[in-house]
Amino acid sequence: MNTQKLFREITEEQFKSDVPAFRPGDTVRVHVKVVEGTRERIQIFEGVVIKRKGGGISETFTVRKISYGVGVERAFPLHSPRVAQIEVVRYGKVRRAKLYYLRNLRGKAARIKEIRR
């Protein structure tokens, strides 16, 4: 068996089929499995998707939220087994693929217009 075929088989079994369609500007709620000692629990991280990067099994997305007045960004591998679930809370209308400019905006200026789907 050649390496390309082996690589394709391994990646196909790692792919998640239940990933919802979301784009930068959308507000998502990511359920992440967190291991603390011997326990495993689900932690929810909700924020705006500021970018999607890569493709295939190595695709990642970055979510930004404001927590106690401080901006927090977290990058997640899309097909990671640590990501239990992704919910789309709100669909936003933006005209860019990378929303890095949100890092410099504060308060109401950082809002994104919502669209109905």
UniProtKB/Swiss-Prot annotation:
UniProt GO molecular function: structural constituent of ribosome
**What Gene3D superfamilies has UniProt attached to this entry?**
2.30.30.790
Q: Which UniProt keywords apply?
A: Ribonucleoprotein, Ribosomal protein
An example of a Gene Ontology cellular component annotation for this protein is: cytosolic large ribosomal subunit
The family database entries (SUPFAM superfamilies) matched by this protein are listed as: Translation proteins SH3-like domain
Looking at the record's lineage, which domain of life comes first? Bacteria
Q: Which PROSITE patterns match?
A: RIBOSOMAL_L19
Write down the InterPro entries for this protein, in alphabetical order: Ribosomal_bL19, Ribosomal_bL19_CS, Ribosomal_bL19_sf, Translation_prot_SH3-like_sf
Query: One biological-process term from Gene Ontology?
Result: translation
Q: What does this protein do?
A: This protein is located at the 30S-50S ribosomal subunit interface and may play a role in the structure and function of the aminoacyl-tRNA binding site.
- HAMAP family on file: Ribosomal_bL19 (MF_00402)
Give the family from UniProt.
Belongs to the bacterial ribosomal protein bL19 family.
- The protein in question is named Large ribosomal subunit protein bL19
